[in-house]
Regions:
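Short coil-to-beta transition motif at edge beta-strands of beta-rich domains
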Residues: 12-13, 76-80, 135-144
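C-terminal cap/linker of serine protease catalytic domains
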Residues: 1-5, 59-71, 196-288
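Catalytic-histidine neighborhood of serine endopeptidases
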Residues: 31-104
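Flexible, gly/ser-rich surface segments that form the specificity/activation loops bordering the active-site cleft
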Residues: 100-103, 123-173, 179-184, 200-215
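Short, surface-exposed secondary-structure boundary micro-motifs
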Residues: 49-51, 147, 193, 202
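A conserved glycine-rich beta-strand in the N-terminal activation segment of trypsin-fold
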Residues: 4, 15-46
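Catalytic nucleophile loop of clan PA
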Residues: 28-31, 178-201
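Short, conserved beta-turn/loop elements at beta-strand boundaries and strand-helix junctions
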Residues: 23, 32-35, 104-107, 163-169
């Protein structure tokens, strides 16, 4: 079990508050490493739920001069992240910074944002390794840590109550640690090692007459397997692989975008032939 210092450092300190245009919630810092291209700066990444920052993603159909057709493109607006500094159990300061969405997946309800604040973040969450997921058991202790009703971060404890809940064809963990609106995007942490299992994303409600009762003890977080699927599909392996880095990940993402446009062009032309990427250079706005 985690001691008092570990509970602070692994469960509480990595949690942030997230504010978008029309929504708010929580986030979890998962990466803070020196920026190899900018001395004395760090690259800081937080995870949150896609529905928390959904207003920051604008989908528009625009004419693409390369493939000569209208193409749906996403345009990112910035969200605001509040990072908290602590003196033991007390908040010493709350620092607001803008952040840019670098990846999102509506299906998994997950997104990754890069903070504009480049100072080192000493406390980041550790995502549960893939080979540890199968060891999870009912009654395992968990902590839900987030900004309930957009309050400053705090944690509540409970246990795992269901290991594979299927909701709308998606897998979740269920837990009985109390959670409420505003916890979305906050962390659900394993209580023995402090691993980040998933992000709080759903709670149970029941309608009684004209009112809605919230079952705060029936919370759901993205299944940890889906966290790893998101990381792999979005080319964000640097979040869990020390041999990878942010800039390599962004290059892979840009290459996939370009390849997708090329394949769309040749499919539209009735030509499935593979092409050399060097033959078709596509200029795009790069991720922050």
């Amino acid at each position: 079990m985690l001691n008092q210092d570990q509970l602070h450092e692994k469960i509480l300190y990595p949690v942030t508050r997230v504010r978008a245009e029309k929504a708010g919630g929580s986030g979890v810092l998962v990466y803070s490493q020196p920026d190899p291209k900018n001395e004395d700066e760090n690259i800081n990444i937080a995870l949150t739920c896609e529905h928390v920052i959904a207003d920051c993603v604008k989908i528009k159909e625009e004419w693409d001069a390369v493939i000569k057709k209208d193409v749906k493109k996403d345009f990112m607006e910035e969200c605001r992240i509040e990072v908290f500094d602590y003196n033991g159990s007390k908040i010493s300061s709350a620092n607001s910074t803008q952040a840019t969405v670098i990846a999102y997946d509506k299906n998994h309800d997950l997104s990754a944002v890069r903070l504009h604040n480049t100072k080192s973040m000493p406390f980041v969450a550790e995502i549960i390794p893939k080979n540890e997921i199968e060891l999870l058991r009912l009654f395992d202790p968990v902590w839900v840590s987030g900004c309930s009703l957009l309050h400053d971060p705090f944690a509540s404890n409970g246990s795992l109550t269901y290991l594979r809940e299927i909701i709308e064809q998606k897998e979740y963990l269920m837990y009985n640690a109390p959670s409420i609106f505003g916890n979305s995007g906050g962390g659900v942490f394993e209580g023995n090692e402090g691993y980040l299992l998933g992000l709080a994303s759903r709670i149970s409600t029941i309608q009684l007459g004209f009112g809605i009762d919230v079952m705060t003890w029936m919370g759901f977080c993205t299944h940890p397997e889906r966290i790893h699927q998101f990381i792999e599909h979005q080319e964000l392996q640097f979040l869990i692989d020390p041999d990878d880095d942010y800039y390599s990940a962004m290059e892979r993402r840009n290459a996939r975008r370009k390849d997708g446009l090329r394949q769309l062009f040749f499919k539209d032309q009735g030509n499935e032939t593979q092409v050399d990427p060097k033959d078709y250079e596509i200029t795009e706005k790069k991720d922050f």
